[in-house]
């Protein structure tokens, strides 16, 4: 379990209650601290992600990394079920990303394998292979599901200014040149062989897209505050 400490300003009045909860806009630092934007000091803290969703009975607390992934394909080829859930309501991006990393299609036999021996002989998920590269206190980054990107979209007015303050790249909300469209880790349930869901950060809408198309992605991380 990830152990975190929350940096807070001392209350001006000893009778004033101190808020120990973690809220959207708080900053996850490389040393495991979660700090309020009001006490964040770039000379002291190294930011890695910004919180966009508090923990509840349906999902862990979630934070979005400061920078995004350049346009990349969901899959190398079509006609390839990559074993994601296909759910538009589950907060299961981590499980989906594991499926993307471990499900491969043999280029010769076109048989799906759970593990690959030589990546040159298998179709894979270029998107999925970009996840799990960063680790902070045993937590790994992954591609969010449809539902998780919905949470991020709802918090953008709070999160984007903090990302910018931390020196990161704000989530793109401009529809120009399809810049607002981001991959989810969720295949379209009715057509998992060929399509996955895109999410628009301009208006919160969703769109089915061929998995071989290239779009941006934004990785997230979850953690378990005590």
Go through each PLM region and give its residues:
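An exposed tryptophan-centered "aromatic clamp" motif
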Residues: 116-142, 146-201
């Amino acid at each position: 379990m990830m152990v975190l400490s929350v940096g807070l300003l001392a209350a001006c009045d000893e009778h004033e209650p101190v808020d120990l909860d973690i809220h959207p806009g708080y900053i996850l630092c490389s040393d495991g601290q979660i700090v309020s934007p009001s006490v964040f000091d770039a000379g002291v803290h190294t930011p890695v992600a910004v919180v966009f969703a508090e923990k509840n009975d349906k999902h862990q607390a979630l934070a979005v990394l400061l920078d995004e992934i350049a346009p990349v394909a969901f899959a190398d080829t079509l006609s390839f079920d990559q074993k994601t859930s296909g759910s538009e309501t589950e907060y299961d991006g981590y499980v989906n990303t594991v499926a993307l990393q471990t499900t491969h299609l043999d280029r010769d036999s076109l048989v799906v394998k759970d593990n690959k021996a030589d990546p040159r002989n298998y179709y894979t998920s270029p998107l999925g292979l970009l996840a799990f590269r960063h680790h902070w206190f045993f937590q790994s980054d992954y591609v969010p599901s449809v539902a998780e990107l919905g949470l991020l979209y709802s918090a953008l007015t709070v999160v984007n200014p903090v990302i910018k303050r931390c020196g990161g790249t704000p989530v793109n909300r401009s529809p120009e040149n399809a810049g607002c469209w981001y991959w989810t880790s969720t295949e379209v349930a009715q057509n998992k062989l060929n399509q996955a869901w895109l999410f628009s950060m301009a208006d919160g809408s969703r769109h089915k897209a061929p998995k071989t198309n290239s779009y941006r992605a934004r990785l997230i991380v979850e953690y378990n505050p005590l």
